[in-house]
Design a protein with these regions (language model features):
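Beta->alpha turn/N-cap motifs
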Residues: 52, 69-74, 110
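Short helix-initiation/N-cap motifs at beta->coil->alpha
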Residues: 46-61
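Pocket-flanking alpha-helical
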Residues: 54-57, 74-80
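Glycine-centered hinge/linker elements that transmit conformational signals in sensory
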Residues: 18-48
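Alpha-to-beta junction loops
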Residues: 61-70, 86
Length: 219
């Protein structure tokens, strides 16, 4: 997530890379890698290998000052340590002076899908209606701290996690969205290659000038 944000903030254009009007060896890509290495000095030594649960637990247990994470972590954080809610704020990923739009956000969604050939169409539709009705969506917002999908839903912000309003205020300024970089490339192999390149930079195994050009055939 951090590497993807840094690339986007530097103005990396995945569509341009895909049609070969831009390249991973361009200055903005290398600079994103350099900033990733700079930031790596502020993380715990185990950061590259920690699971999502380990990283989140380190935050809500007070072992880490900051967590780079999506709003989906709100319920996990508050559920495991309710006393932590009053200490936990939210801010958007910072911009880079003179670079790309700082109000672009990584946005992911929860999706309910039904097979067109299911033998239980009525039951599947009923389940989707249950998950998307006002009662379920109020629970999603007021307990889970996640964005409801029902337009103009009345949310009791005294009941909802405090972090929900922080995130909504940030998203109100969003000018565009993008996905995780490893999921946005041409293939699963390319996504894995991107992850591996960024991990090598983060750990100091290779410099950005070494790690990225080594993998351009796959990326």
């Amino acid at each position: 997530m951090i590497a993807g944000y840094l690339c986007d903030r530097q103005g990396v254009d995945l569509a341009a890379i895909a049609d070969h009007t831009a390249n991973w060896t361009d200055e903005n890509c290398i600079e994103a890698g350099t900033k990733l290495k700079d930031l790596s000095q502020y993380f715990q030594a185990t950061a590259a290998g920690d699971s999502n649960d380990q990283a989140t637990a380190a935050f809500y247990n007070g072992e880490a000052a900051m967590l780079v994470q999506g709003s989906w972590a709100i319920a996990q954080i508050n559920g495991n340590n309710p006393d932590f809610e009053s200490k936990c704020g939210v801010f958007q990923f910072p911009g880079i002076d003179g670079a790309n739009d700082p109000n672009r956000m990584i946005v992911k969604t929860d999706n309910l899908l039904m097979s067109s050939t299911t033998e239980h169409q009525d039951a599947a539709i009923a389940l989707m209606k249950m998950f998307t009705d006002e009662t379920a969506q109020k629970y999603t917002a007021e307990v889970g701290g996640k964005f409801p999908i029902v337009k103009d839903l009345e949310i009791d912000y005294d009941k909802a996690p405090a972090q929900l309003k922080y995130v909504q205020d940030i998203m109100a300024k969003a000018t565009g969205t993008f996905g995780f970089y490893n999921e946005s490339l041409a293939s699963v192999e390319a996504g894995d290659c991107f992850d591996n390149a960024m991990v090598d930079i983060f750990l100091g195994n290779q410099t950005p000038e070494e790690s990225i050009p080594d993998r351009t055939d796959i990326l």
